[in-house]
Swiss-Prot record:
Its EC number is 3.6.4.13. Its main location: nucleus. GO terms for molecular function: ATP binding; ATP hydrolysis activity; RNA binding; RNA helicase activity. CDD domains: DEADc_DDX39, SF2_C_DEAD. This is ATP-dependent RNA helicase SUB2-1. It comes from Vanderwaltozyma polyspora (strain ATCC 22028 / DSM 70294 / BCRC 21397 / CBS 2163 / NBRC 10782 / NRRL Y-8283 / UCD 57-17).
Amino acid sequence: MSHEGEEDLLEYSDNEQDIQVDASKAAEPSELDATTAEDASNGDAEKKGSYVGIHSTGFKDFLLKPELARAIIDCGFEHPSEVQQHTIPQSIHGTDVLCQAKSGLGKTAVFVLSTLQQLDPVPGEVSVVVICNARELAYQIRNEYLRFSKYMPDVKTAVFYGGTPINKDAELLKNKETAPHIVVATPGRLKALVRDKLIDLSHVKNFVIDECDKVLEELDMRRDVQDIFRATPRDKQVMMFSATLSEEIRPICRRFLQNPLEIFVDDEAKLTLHGLQQYYTKLQENEKNRKLAQLLDDLEFNQVIIFVKSTKRANELTKLLNESNFPAITVHGHMKQAERIARYKAFKEFEKRICVSTDVFGRGIDIERINLAINYDLTTEADQYLHRVGRAGRFGTKGLAISFVSSPEDEEVLGKIQERFDVKIAEFPEEGIDPSTYLNN
């Protein structure tokens, strides 16, 4: 890889012969109720949950460290999901991994458990680097490390992202008492820390990119990742994960990998979400607000996420909803970092049931109570549609997704989505639908 010029710290998160395993032939997952990780730092690590498991194999059969096995039991996990079953046995032994599996099947746990299994913490040395595209996702991954390392008191994890003072990161890194063994970061901030020689990555043994297609498809972000990658040893494990991996992005991913295990759980053409009901409704642009209010009145839901195309529309729609007695919160990339994280936590902790968001919440964010996703503004990309609606119906639980179609461009995108994922999206019936089709018992 050629050495790229140094760039200023950028914000990315709000964008307005290989071993191959074909897991698509495996048995269909059973639909088990599930909950995702709660914020470990808030003392919610004892919440119980279960990934959609289809194998009689238990996590105990992976022969993990006793400390890890105990944390897994505390979380209520017994059987691995399909992607975990196919990946963990080799990833814990240092094999490079390229993994595509639909939203909600526990990809995060694959690299969290695999890296913790291999970790032998040395004070002051960074052993694991995890890169992701969004600050909220970095925060969430950090919390997964916290809950699975709860019985590994010597292990320290830190998260670094833009929008916070870099001198605070520097202070944490230079103090051996606080220096992390595991770093979760967005590319821009980590590149800046490397550039300014504030972090030493010469001891890294595991290099992970989550949502790798999003991280590597943008040239500026890819350059930052390359600079970070060059600061790590040549001999290390590299793992990449995403819900979508197009044929075009796979060769770019493979440049970072050596003889990888390639896992594709469900063929790309069939990236459907078990238990998720998908509909569209045709309307004029000026009818969207009335229709949204009607849906929020008529539908039964725990929490709903409403996707819009811009920060301005997010703010305006949230204001309108609150004025109409629909208490709502908004999250987008243009608000101050502390406010954004606070709102994310408030929504996750069920302080509000309605969240209006740009695509900053469109990838990887796990909030287990969301069972309704509404595309107020339909995305322009088929892959992004999957990431958006994947916020509902996580881990095989039921959910409902409704997309507003208000223009010929929207109709064209809807057609591409159905063709891309080999799925039929029906028009939402005027009389509504039976709540039992999208609500768990």
